[in-house]
């Protein structure tokens, strides 16, 4: 049913576009991740399956269609993410904010998480989304500092950290939960992973997801290492020991993996 509704509403889900391996599990739990602002990204990160090129024109009706779909499906948790839209002055922040606002109007019980780009450091864009009142703000660091410029040539490691820091500072919701995610298997070391975790904790990041990098095609960055389940367990323990409220680590873990569960854990967290 969810796929039918998404298709009929002319919506994109990152579950499909990014070929997420957990699509069935999340949809069964009334959690879905919607990819707004089209299906074409203005950047060309060498790990990502989403197509790149010149995006389509802005669809101002998208927030209402998305909210109607969320309401009809009775979702418990909706994640809103997007392609990068560096062609737009605000990076698409207005549409992000409208999506949150429309969901709030139609299904107030649904928790909303936003997984945003860096908006090239435009804090007005970031603030406009925070004013709409998401429950969780997510921005992925993706990889360790050394490898970052190799796979995210148009991004910046320190800017990504600053986005997470600014989200906490700008939000009027002092209980805002922040979250980030990273891939492993790109050639990083254990020490580099730990350093990235420490960097994220320095900007008060609450939640962390860690998954195995899976090469979308032979044109993308090769896999340097396959992590074992035990190694993922060690990474989860490392993150929890460093103070994250919840760490989801595993071969098939992605940013939105059990997002509703992560949010509940953080919301009920006590030291």
Model-derived segments and spans:
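Glycine/Thr-rich phosphate-binding loops of Rossmann-like dinucleotide-binding domains
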Residues: 44, 88, 147, 218, ...
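Nucleotide phosphate-binding site architecture
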Residues: 21, 42, 145
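Core AdoMet radical
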Residues: 49-65, 72-123, 129-165, 179, ...
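Canonical Radical SAM [4Fe-4S] cluster-binding loop centered on the CxxxCxxC motif
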Residues: 25-62
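Small/polar loops that bind or transfer phosphate-bearing groups
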Residues: 36-37, 114, 249
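Auxiliary Fe-S-binding modules of radical SAM enzymes
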Residues: 1-33, 64, 68, 98-109, ...
